[in-house]
């Protein structure tokens, strides 16, 4: 059982839900990203989702797009991110999921990437612009290294396609709670509840809800429907607002603690 499965099992036994936190690697720089990730762990985050910056992040809203541009300007690369994760593994045992686009992985080399990601301590991969039908080559490489290939299901996903995605899912299923890009709308509880029931008929894997969750109240409400939630834009916005502050990691940690507390109420 890998770190992702162990985490969901442990949380289930405790009657808790997973807080998955997304940050863009290299924003404001990789040294501070490392400090932020440590702060997230101290704040009670259960799974770290580390974004690989890309120049054309079509699934991301303006907050994360801006973070990607800042990270690229500081020279952040996939190779340097993997180095950071490997260094982070000396002090953090939380599951790490890489979130990004296919282009940087393709440019790096899929086999080389899978080997390096495994060696660095990555547990899962979510490639937002790689549909199921086009993922087999990369997935073959990641499967051979024991990395979970995490898949997305959206409100617009048909029943037939949902069934196919669910059958091939690993680690957990990521349900996109809104149509559009990250951080730009608020999910409807009724819609999310209905879609989660639909997904659960096709898979027993843990299910997390992401996109549009930014407050403790939203976290509490949506966590009650799923096995966990993902918060991204709210963390990235907080990082941007405090990038030059010596209290950056502490403020991110405090916000994580506030979210996690709300999820337990």
UniProtKB/Swiss-Prot annotation:
SUPFAM superfamilies in the record: Ribulose-phoshate binding barrel
Domain of life: Bacteria
A GO CC term assigned to this protein in UniProt: cytosol
Enzyme Commission number(s) of this protein: 4.2.1.20
Catalyzed chemical reaction(s): (1S,2R)-1-C-(indol-3-yl)glycerol 3-phosphate + L-serine = D-glyceraldehyde 3-phosphate + L-tryptophan + H2O
Pathway: Amino-acid biosynthesis; L-tryptophan biosynthesis; L-tryptophan from chorismate: step 5/5
CDD domains for this protein: Tryptophan_synthase_alpha
Family listed: Belongs to the TrpA family.
Native source organism of the sequence: Syntrophus aciditrophicus (strain SB)
Any GO molecular function: tryptophan synthase activity
UniProt enzyme class: lyase
UniProt cross-references to Pfam families, sorted A to Z: Trp_syntA (PF00290)
Active site: 49 (proton acceptor), 60 (proton acceptor)
Annotated keywords: Amino-acid biosynthesis, Aromatic amino acid biosynthesis, Lyase, Tryptophan biosynthesis
InterPro entries attached to this UniProt entry: Aldolase_TIM, RibuloseP-bd_barrel, Trp_synthase_suA
Subunit structure: Tetramer of two alpha and two beta chains.
Cited function: The alpha subunit is responsible for the aldol cleavage of indoleglycerol phosphate to indole and glyceraldehyde 3-phosphate.
NCBIfam families: trpA (TIGR00262)
Protein name: Tryptophan synthase alpha chain
């Amino acid at each position: 059982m890998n770190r992702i499965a162990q985490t969901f099992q442990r949380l289930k036994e405790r009657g808790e839900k997973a807080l998955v936190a997304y940050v863009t690697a290299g924003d404001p720089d990789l040294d501070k990203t490392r400090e932020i990730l440590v702060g997230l762990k101290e704040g009670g985050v259960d799974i770290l989702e580390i974004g690989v910056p890309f120049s054309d992040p079509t699934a991301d809203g303006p907050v994360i797009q801006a973070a990607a541009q800042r990270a690229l300007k500081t020279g952040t690369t996939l190779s340097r991110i993997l180095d950071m994760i490997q260094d982070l593994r000396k002090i953090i045992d939380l599951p790490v999921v890489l979130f990004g686009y296919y282009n940087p992985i393709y440019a790096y080399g899929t086999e080389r990437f899978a080997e390096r990601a495994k060696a660095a301590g990555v547990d899962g991969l979510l490639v937002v612009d790689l549909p199921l039908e086009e993922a087999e080559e990369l997935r073959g490489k990641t499967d051979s290294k024991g990395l979970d290939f995490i898949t997305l299901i959206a409100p617009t996903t048909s029943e037939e396609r949902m069934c196919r995605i669910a059958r091939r899912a690993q680690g957990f299923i990521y349900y996109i709670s809104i149509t559009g890009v990250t951080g730009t709308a608020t999910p409807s509880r009724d819609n999310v509840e209905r879609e989660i029931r639909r997904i659960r008929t096709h898979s027993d894997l843990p299910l997390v809800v992401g996109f549009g969750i930014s407050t403790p109240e939203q976290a509490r409400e949506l966590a009650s429907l799923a096995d966990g939630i993902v918060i991204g834009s709210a963390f990235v916005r907080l990082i941007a607002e405090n990038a030059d502050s010596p209290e950056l990691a502490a403020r991110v940690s405090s916000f994580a603690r506030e979210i996690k507390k709300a999820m337990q109420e």
